[in-house]
């Protein structure tokens, strides 16, 4: 179970087509060498696609790119959506409205490397069933050791 290196969730998400806002959770260990860390997005629209994002900084851009949600990360941010090189994959929320991903902390997007003592922020993006739009979860920060 993740210890106190995980801060509280931040950045209020907008409700998606389920009527609920989607929320982030993390589990596992913030110890980089353990390589046992899982991101989970809950209360997503059913049967929709999405992926996780990360950034060293927090931000707030409402309805970014015409979405129904708020981007809670600062720039630059990185996407866990490239299955071809093992740094991520596009995920499916299924009938439970949730998806999880356990990144390889030694093979992060765009050659990012987590350093001991750094704080990183995570958020999930997903399609929303309200027409041709998308939405985001809230954000969560984690200090790695």
Can you annotate each of these PLM segments?
Residues 1-145:
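Residue-level hotspots within well-ordered secondary structure
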């Amino acid at each position: 179970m993740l210890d106190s290196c995980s801060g509280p969730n931040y950045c209020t998400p907008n409700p998606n087509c389920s009527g609920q806002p989607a929320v982030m959770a993390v589990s596992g260990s913030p110890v980089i060498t353990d390589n046992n860390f899982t991101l989970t997005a809950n209360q997503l629209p059913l049967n929709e696609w999405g992926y996780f994002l990360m950034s060293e900084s927090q931000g707030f851009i409402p309805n970014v790119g015409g979405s129904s949600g708020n981007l809670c990360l600062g720039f630059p941010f990185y996407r866990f959506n490239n299955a071809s090189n093992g740094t991520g994959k596009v995920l499916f929320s299924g009938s439970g409205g949730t998806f999880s991903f356990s990144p390889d902390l030694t093979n992060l997007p765009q050659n990012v490397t987590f350093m001991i003592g750094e704080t990183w922020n995570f958020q999930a993006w997903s399609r929303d069933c309200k027409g041709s739009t998308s939405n985001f979860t809230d954000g969560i920060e984690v200090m790695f050791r």
